[in-house]
């Protein structure tokens, strides 16, 4: 868009909201700072302890623009990340044939978005007319999803592996456990979002739609930007045997068991639960699914096809499961239909066309 059109939009936005936004070239920046410290302690001949601390602090400016979208200078957001983690690892020889590795860690991750100001979000369509090839959409105001957006994660990990050497067999027994605490604030249109179908309608302040979202202060103790906390974990146990059948061939087989759990429940929604029961749905807001045990058997081999060990053939088969994306599941704590509230106002005529609501 031209500078004259940008100034026209900025002046009208200031007139409507009292907030002045820029329309020059944005200063996009990103920085990262990292720190690593480590201590190794040989306690004695059989025990060694390692402590490691890692810190990272970074930010990255984001502007969601493309060939069909123009965003004003202060309408982007800055993504901030701060991570602190500490790891302790103890390795021990427990006898002639026993070796143990114990590891514990704690990570504290803070992700949040910064915006230049908290103001209404405005979207103006068809700024250069209604030709689909040449028109453009303009966004001004606080970015739609960034006015109230942060994710705090505390992750605690405990792992232990015991190896037992028995001739041509190496047995491994272990456990890997993770505890999560997540607090996720995500409220779109927290300052209100206004939608206009053309530049002329924006100058006349005639929107076709308005939306606003918040958390109910009567249910959150007066907080209109409340974030739910979710506590969860994943517990893993495994056993494995590495069998050296010959100098050229070994076989590894074992079983891993994982148990993902959620420790707390989202808020109950009696209205929905009553309706679901009447409809015969086996679903209730406020209840988590019961923990499910995941079995993952595996087998693999390594085969040197000749004594010179120049050619190696490897293969295996098994069932593999990764970490459960608990941050996605935490959305269920946000969207119970209780704390999170919102309104959308629009008006249509008999043919389904939007009318101005101003």
Q: Where do the model's predicted regions map?
A:
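Extended, hydrophobic alpha-helical segments in both membrane/secreted and soluble proteins
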Residues: 235-239, 249-264, 295-297, 301
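Solvent-exposed loop/turn elements at secondary-structure boundaries
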Residues: 266-296, 300-358
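Short coil turns and loop connectors of transmembrane beta-barrels in diderm outer membranes
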Residues: 44-46, 95-97, 167-168, 245-247, ...
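Aromatic- and glycine-enriched glycan-recognition loops and surfaces
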Residues: 28-34, 231, 288-296
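Glycine-rich, acidic and aromatic/proline-enriched surface loops and short helix-turn segments
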Residues: 6-12, 55-56, 257-262
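Outer-membrane beta-barrel pore proteins
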Residues: 1, 26-29, 41-44, 304-307
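Surface-exposed beta-strand-turn/loop segments characteristic
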Residues: 1-31
């Amino acid at each position: 868009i031209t500078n004259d059109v940008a100034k026209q939009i900025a002046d009208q936005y200031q007139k409507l909201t009292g907030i002045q936004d820029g329309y020059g070239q944005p200063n996009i920046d990103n920085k990262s700072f990292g720190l690593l410290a480590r201590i190794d302690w040989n306690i004695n001949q059989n025990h060694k302890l390692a402590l490691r601390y890692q810190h990272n602090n970074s930010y990255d400016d984001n502007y969601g623009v493309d060939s069909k979208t123009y965003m004003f200078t202060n309408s982007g957001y800055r993504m901030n990340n701060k991570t602190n983690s500490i790891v302790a690892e103890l390795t021990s020889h427990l006898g002639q044939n026993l070796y143990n590795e114990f590891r514990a860690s704690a990570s504290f991750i803070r992700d949040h978005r910064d915006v230049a100001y908290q103001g209404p979000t405005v979207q103006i369509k068809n700024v250069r007319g209604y030709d689909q090839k040449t028109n453009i959409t303009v966004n001004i105001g606080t970015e739609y999803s960034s006015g109230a957006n942060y994710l705090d994660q505390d992750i605690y990990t405990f792992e232990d592996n015991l190896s037992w050497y028995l001739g041509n067999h190496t047995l491994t027994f272990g456990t890997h456990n993770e505890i999560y605490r997540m607090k996720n604030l995500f409220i779109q249109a927290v300052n209100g979002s206004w939608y206009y179908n053309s530049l002329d309608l924006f100058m006349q302040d005639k929107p076709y739609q308005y939306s606003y979202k918040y958390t109910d202060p009567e249910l959150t103790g007066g907080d209109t930007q409340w974030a739910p906390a979710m506590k969860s974990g994943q517990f893993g146990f495994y056993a494995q045997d590495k069998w050296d059948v010959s100098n050229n061939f070994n076989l590894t087989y074992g079983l891993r068991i994982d148990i993902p759990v959620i420790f707390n429940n989202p808020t109950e929604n009696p209205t929905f639960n009553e309706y679901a029961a009447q409809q015969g749905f086996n679903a209730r807001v406020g209840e988590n699914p019961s923990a499910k045990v995941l079995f993952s058997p595996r087998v693999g081999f390594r085969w040197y096809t000749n004594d010179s060990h120049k050619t190696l053939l490897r293969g295996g088969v098994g069932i593999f499961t990764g970490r459960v994306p608990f941050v996605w599941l935490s959305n269920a704590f946000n969207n119970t239909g209780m704390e999170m509230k919102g309104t959308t106002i629009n008006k249509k005529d008999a043919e389904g066309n939007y009318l101005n609501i101003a």
